[in-house]
Curated annotation (Swiss-Prot):
InterPro entries noted in UniProt: AsnASE_II, Asp/glu_Ase-like_sf, Asparaginase/glutaminase-like, Asparaginase/glutaminase_AS1, Asparaginase/glutaminase_AS2, Asparaginase_C, L-asparaginase_C, L-asparaginase_N
Organism expressing this protein natively: Pseudomonas sp. (strain ATCC 29598 / 7A)
Top-level taxonomy: Bacteria, Pseudomonadati, Pseudomonadota
One Pfam family in the UniProt entry: Asparaginase_C
Assigned protein family: Belongs to the asparaginase 1 family.
Subunit structure: Homotetramer.
Superkingdom of origin: Bacteria
Compartmental location: Periplasm
GO cellular component: periplasmic space
Location (main, coarse): periplasm
GO molecular function, one term: asparaginase activity
Enzyme active site: T20 (acyl-ester intermediate)
Record protein name field: Glutaminase-asparaginase
NCBIfam families documented for this protein: asnASE_II
Length: 337
């Protein structure tokens, strides 16, 4: 009977990369002071025995680092491994445990590059497993519940945190000290309650099986950097980043991706000498950058990031510039993804 039950359950692979969900503190009172990336995947799985009721689960340690240290090479390595597993007939869904600092970047990268409709779920925690009221175990349980559910297919890469199912494209970390840290400007896709998924909306942008980007065809990514704008900003950082090899600069601007009059000449010159300029917004609750509203984007040959924050804009530009250097094509890609 146990064998029959296992045959009925979905097969889910948990790929572990480190982060707070694999962290440990000196005492149970340490919810914010701890060392990330200490606990291995087998111990994570053993800590949630209820996973066996949801799926046939096996784990694999892909890397063991804090997510602020993840590089483009790490993203490519992870993406290629996920793609290999997604191609396997005996894998129904994949969960990736990840640090929360750059979880939103990895989720969006995978959303753009994995040509599969199988459920891919990225999950983390805001507290280490050693802390009182740790959130990692339930987050992992919810992630496996979503990944093992056929209704999760075709919805792009998902993120499960704090009982919510978020789109990997839309979600971002909004605070660093609370468990309800991950929000989407346009709201969650759904909720998980006691292992059952409830869906409220679908992603509107191109992703996964409808994406023109394929992780299997990408071996390297161009250097793209982010420069932060503020009152009394100077052009020093922008020029330095371009001089040090940035093929594109994400302008993390105020408001509508606004460009200070002190910056405009430098950004115009950088664009004329070959550096792509992408205007984004660093407002807290989600920017929405309009083209040619205040800045003459057509005249300056600049690109706008639409509703993507600077971090996600960087991911999309890196992938887009593998295919094209044309600013009009880059803008088309921003509208569609």
């Amino acid at each position: 009977k146990e064998v029959e039950n296992q045959q009925k359950l979905a097969n889910v692979v948990i790929l572990a990369t480190g982060g707070t969900i694999a962290g440990a503190g000196a005492s149970a009172a340490n919810s914010a002071t701890y060392q990330a990336a200490k606990v291995g995947v087998d111990k994570l799985i053993a800590g949630v025995p209820e996973l066996a009721d949801l799926a046939n689960v096996r784990g694999e340690q892909v890397m063991q680092i804090a997510s602020e240290s993840i590089t483009n090479d790490d993203l490519l390595k992870l993406g290629k491994r996920v793609a290999e597993l997604a191609d396997s007939n005996d894998v129904d869904g994949i969960v990736i445990t990840h640090g929360t600092d750059t979880l939103e970047e990895t989720a969006y990268f995978l959303d753009l590059t994995l040509n599969t409709d199988k459920p891919i779920v990225v999950v983390g925690s805001m507290r280490p497993g050693t802390a009182m009221s740790a959130d990692g175990m339930l987050n992992l349980y919810n992630a496996v519940a979503v990944a093992s559910n056929k209704d999760s297919r075709g919805k792009g890469v998902l993120v499960t945190m704090n009982d919510e199912i978020q789109s990997g494209r839309d979600v971002s970390k909004s605070i660093n000290i609370k468990t309800e840290a991950f929000k989407s400007a346009w709201g969650p896709l759904g909720m998980v309650v006691e292992g059952k998924s409830y869906w409220f909306r679908l992603p509107a942008k191109r992703h996964t099986v409808n994406s023109e980007f394929d992780i299997k065809q990408i071996s390297s990514l161009p250097q793209v950097d982010i420069a932060y704008s503020y009152g009394n900003v100077t052009d020093t950082a922008y020029k330095a980043l371009a001089q040090n090899g940035a093929k594109a600069l994400i302008h993390a601007g105020t408001g509508n991706g606004s460009v200070s009059s002190r910056l405009t000449p430098a950004l115009q010159t950088l664009r004329k000498t070959g550096t792509q300029i992408i205007r984004s917004s660093h407002v807290n609750q989600g920017g929405f950058v309009l083209r040619n509203a205040e800045q003459p984007d057509d005249k300056n040959d600049w690109v706008v990031a639409h509703d993507l924050n600077p971090e996600k804009a960087r991911i999309l530009v890196e992938l887009a510039m593998v295919k094209t250097q044309d600013s009009k094509e880059l803008q088309r890609i921003f509208w569609e993804y």
